[in-house]
């Protein structure tokens, strides 16, 4: 009985090693094809799709390599073309190379599906629930990076940008977010290795990036796809509905300052009022030159009662109506 158990374990180990080697070869072929261009990438994807290849990501997720002809794809070519035109700063073609799916027992179609795309400039995106998420600036970095679907790396369609402000306005902003997430991921992995091999270190302070990475790892360990918007505070703080509820000015409002009551100005001196002429001009002498106004305006100010101070709340700025995203967020 013991000999049979050891033999089975050895066979399983050999099969796992063979599967790992084949996965590495297939991933290397995809990386090489992506560097050669979109035609080579489409050919490599079609070849792996015929084999039914499912490649393991470093995070533990399995990527089903396929193109838009995949029978269980939950979007069509029209939707892909629409995303290419309505998710700035993306202005390139989206080349589909795989999906990450979640299935429930006896389900006819996937219960959840992440569709993976690559652009001719090697940027990798994931599509989920109407939003594109930037995952990596190249195919090689995608297979070793963190799968995080957060507000910072999201590209909202322009049709909903009057509900939520867009965080990244250029592709460089998205690449910067990727490097920040990758840095936090490497720090966490190095700390775990050090705790295993040597004396324990102090826990790292948990910021929004670390929280998103840890939640993504936890979901993957449970056999689930990482959820979107773990950091709800960032999303809520940039929701225009939340901003209007708190009394802030709309993002397109011009800059304003705190206004005070009008200054106390001397009454105009007329020739028919000699008593007023005899009054020493002490107030006029102490009035700064900036408060001297025309007589007509001065008479209106002196006859109207003083107004209370007007305090203007914080004002936010954007480049225009095209930079704001409207999306109804349920939290």
UniProtKB/Swiss-Prot annotation:
The keyword Glycoprotein does not apply. InterPro entries: US22-like. Its main location: host cell. Keywords: Host cytoplasm, Host nucleus, Host-virus interaction, Modulation of host cell apoptosis by virus. The keyword Chloroplast does not apply. Residues 275-304 have a biased composition (Low complexity). Residues 246-309 are annotated as: Disordered. GO terms for biological process: symbiont-mediated perturbation of host apoptosis. GO terms for cellular component: host cell cytoplasm; host cell nucleus; viral tegument. It is found in: Host cytoplasm; Host nucleus. It holds the Pfam family US22. Plays a role in the inhibition of host apoptosis to facilitate efficient viral replication. Promotes stabilization and inactivation of host TP53 through interaction with host MDM2. Induces host mTORC1 activation by antagonizing the ability of host TSC1/2 to negatively regulate mTORC1. Thus, inhibits a growth regulatory pathway to facilitate viral replication. Prevents premature cell host cell death by blocking host ubiquitin-specific protease 24/USP24-mediated autophagic ferritin degradation in lysosomes thus maintaining lysosome integrity and cellular viability. Interacts with host MDM2; this interaction leads to the stabilization of host TP53. Interacts with host TSC2; this interaction prevents host cell stress responses. Interacts with host USP24. Belongs to the beta-herpesvirinae UL38 protein family. This is Apoptosis inhibitor UL38.
């Amino acid at each position: 009985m013991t000999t049979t158990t050891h033999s089975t374990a050895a066979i399983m180990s050999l099969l796992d090693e063979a599967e790992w080697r084949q996965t590495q070869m297939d991933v290397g072929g995809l990386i090489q094809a992506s560097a050669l261009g979109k035609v080579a990438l489409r050919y490599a994807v079609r070849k792996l799709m015929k084999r039914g290849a499912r490649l393991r990501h470093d995070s533990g997720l399995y990527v089903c390599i396929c193109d838009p002809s995949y029978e269980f794809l939950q979007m069509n070519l029209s939707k892909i073309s629409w995303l290419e035109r309505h998710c700035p700063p993306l202005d390139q073609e989206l080349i589909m190379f795989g999906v990450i799916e979640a299935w429930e027992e006896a389900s006819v179609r996937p219960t959840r599906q992440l569709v993976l795309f690559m652009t001719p400039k090697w940027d990798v995106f994931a599509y989920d629930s109407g939003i594109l998420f930037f995952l990596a600036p190249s195919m090689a970095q995608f297979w070793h990076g963190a799968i995080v679907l957060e507000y910072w790396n999201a590209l909202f369609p322009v049709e909903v940008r009057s509900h939520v402000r867009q965080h990244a306005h250029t592709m460089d902003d998205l690449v910067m977010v990727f490097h920040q997430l990758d840095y936090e991921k490497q720090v966490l992995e190095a700390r775990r290795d050090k705790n295993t091999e040597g004396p324990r270190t102090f826990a790292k302070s948990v910021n929004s990036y670390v929280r998103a990475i840890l939640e993504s790892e936890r979901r993957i360990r449970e056999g689930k796809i990482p959820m979107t918007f773990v950091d709800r505070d960032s999303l809520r703080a940039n929701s225009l509905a939340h901003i209007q509820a708190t009394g802030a000015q709309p993002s397109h409002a011009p800059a304003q300052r705190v206004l005070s009551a009008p200054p106390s100005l001397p009454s105009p001196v007329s020739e028919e009022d000699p008593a007023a002429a005899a009054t020493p001009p002490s107030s006029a002498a102490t009035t700064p030159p900036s408060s001297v106004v025309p007589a007509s305006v001065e008479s209106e100010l002196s006859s109207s009662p003083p107004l209370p101070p007007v305090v203007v709340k914080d004002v936010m700025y954007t480049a225009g109506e095209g930079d704001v995203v409207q999306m109804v967020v349920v939290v």
